[in-house]
Amino acid sequence: MSFLLRPSSRTVIRFRPALHLASLGLLSTLCLTLPAHATAASDSQQALAQLEERASQASPREQCFLYAQIVHAMTEQAGQQIADGDTEQAAATLQQVNRYARLIHLNLAHNAKRLKDAEELIHNTTYRLAECLHLVSGPDKATVQDTLKQLDQVNDELLTQVFAH
């Protein structure tokens, strides 16, 4: 029975090239995914810039939803920056989130289009930012709390507008 437990020398030799190929495949996969992370960040920056451009040129009725999309994307970006430990960049991103939240507030008076979609997006964004609140401390926590307060206010205003129409 011990012959069943011991692999024969033929078996080991036969699988050795497969191990090398598997190792090579794993190594090449790792090497290819590292630049993909940098490319993904660059792509998301480009998409965000395009969204900002589209929002700046959109009609006042459409801007509310586009700004909500920008706030959502920037909050996700800030969450990733917080998770990566880049709190200074996250604080700058959250300042931009505050700016766009104020723009949403100002555009509500223009009979905004897709109010319910914008409200749902801001609600999800607020929830995500509340999760990020537990990852920061000190002065960074105050920045996140201020942004969260601003988004809560915008969400309440959006809800009021949704139920008014």
PLM feature spans:
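Bacterial N-terminal signal peptides
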Residues: 18-33
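N-terminal secretory signal peptides that target proteins for export/translocation
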Residues: 1-16
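N-terminal targeting/docking segments
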Residues: 11-15, 34, 108
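Long, charged/polar, soluble alpha-helical segments
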Residues: 38-165
